[in-house]
Design a protein with these regions (language model features):
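Nucleic-acid substrate recognition interfaces
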Residues: 1-385
């Protein structure tokens, strides 16, 4: 079994320059391969990885592209393999048509393969192709490294994601089973009686984020107009490209740091909650939510996107696979909130999200909306085991 582990690396200036150059080269090769396949497709011809790989070989011999020799050759080939995989997913209707990669995307990455032990850990350093030994922060022991993805974030931090061999040990058997109903106010309510409040990290940082984003927008608008207004006076500003304006780039980094903090807080929360549920329960029953459909509700879309249900469910699923637990899913349109968990009566009035408590007209049971839904989800899940 394989898993990905992420560590921060601290390349020196020459290593940073080479990483950035490799990112640019991989993007160039990917885009050239995509353009070649697109043109062939438009002309009724079908080409694949073999033809684009031959194109790369030709470019390396061209003096105009001499800089390709400085980049990791395996990473260049891998960018074409990734392109080929993207086309295969497209033709199987598992994804959209591949898009060209932009140098303006602030998060960039490339992937390289471990061949002949050219990727290995030595003390506080990791050896990477072309880069040599790069200082990194290892926080856990890992198995054999299969491949590595080198990432540069929007805040100019560098990371490696190592795909490693992993042999998980199954957790001790427990008789505990649990059903959970996810929500926006409470992240989830469980049949155990536990409820976890939605931390709302985005909402808590929204005021500061909006302020810094407005500040960045004003700086960009002033730069484009060529003038900066102070009071009643207008002052000319530099005519450098945006990428060379240090103050604008500093402000962009401020905005990116806020986004990064929100992402890190959310990921930490999701990891801890998913691990807790996996450790304590043998069977976990969840809803098979159509999140993309729920996002069509524009009033709730921002909150639904922020709460990250899909990511949480994904974590539960792969951790259950690792540690010998069982995840069951109630069907997408199962009316878990409307059904009485005691007698099975379906109360369509409960479709109204404002109704948080209700009394079953059939058996008289008083229900908390979310707890009742969690019980129904568990019962449905157990029936599917």
């Amino acid at each position: 079994m394989n898993k990905g582990v992420k560590f921060r690396i601290y390349p020196n200036k020459s290593q940073q320059s080479l990483i950035n150059q490799t990112l640019g080269c991989c993007r160039l090769i990917y885009n050239k391969g995509l353009a070649m396949r697109k043109d062939s497709f438009d002309n009724g011809l079908k080409i694949g990885y073999k033809e684009t790989s031959a194109m790369l070989t030709g470019l390396k011999k061209d003096n105009e592209y001499f800089f390709l020799k400085d980049a990791d050759s395996i990473a260049l080939q891998q960018s074409l393999r990734d392109l080929d995989s993207a086309f295969k997913r497209f033709f199987k209707k598992l994804g959209g048509y591949p898009n060209f990669k932009s140098k303006h995307n602030h998060n960039q990455s490339y992937r390289t393969i471990n061949q002949g032990d050219n990727i290995r850990i030595s003390g506080k350093y990791i050896k990477l192709p072309k880069l040599g030994y790069v200082k990194f922060k290892q926080s856990m022991d890992i198995g054999h490294i299969n491949n590595v993805t080198v990432e540069r974030t929007s805040t100019n931090k560098y990371f490696v994601v190592l795909n490693v061999d992993f042999e998980p040990a199954a957790l001790p058997f427990t008789s505990k089973v649990i059903g959970i109903d996810v929500g926006l106010k409470e992240f989830y309510k469980a049949t155990s009686g536990d409820s976890v409040t939605n931390p709302k990290y985005l909402e808590k940082s929204s005021k500061k984020l909006a302020h810094e984003q407005r500040k960045l927008s004003h700086m960009i608008e002033s730069h484009i107009s060529g003038y900066k207004t102070i009071g009643n006076k207008r002052f000319p500003i530099c005519d450098k490209p945006l990428s060379e304006c240090k103050n604008i780039q500093k402000q962009r980094k401020k905005v990116a740091l806020i986004h990064e903090k929100i992402t890190n807080q959310r990921n930490d929360f999701l990891q801890k909650e998913s691990t807790k549920l996996i450790r304590e329960n043998q069977i976990i029953s969840i809803e098979d939510l159509n999140v993309s459909g729920l996002l069509q509700n524009h009033k709730l879309a921002k909150s639904i996107s922020s709460v990250s249900w899909s990511k949480f469910f994904t974590m539960l699923e792969y951790k259950a696979k690792w540690y010998g637990r069982i995840i069951t899913k109630a069907p997408t349109f199962y009316p878990s909130s409307q059904m009485c968990s005691c007698c099975g009566y379906k109360n369509t009035d409960v479709k109204d999200l404002k109704i948080r408590k209700w009394i079953c007209p059939e058996c008289g049971t008083v229900h908390d909306r979310d707890f009742n839904a969690a019980v129904n989800i568990l019962n449905k899940g157990l029936a599917l085991v």
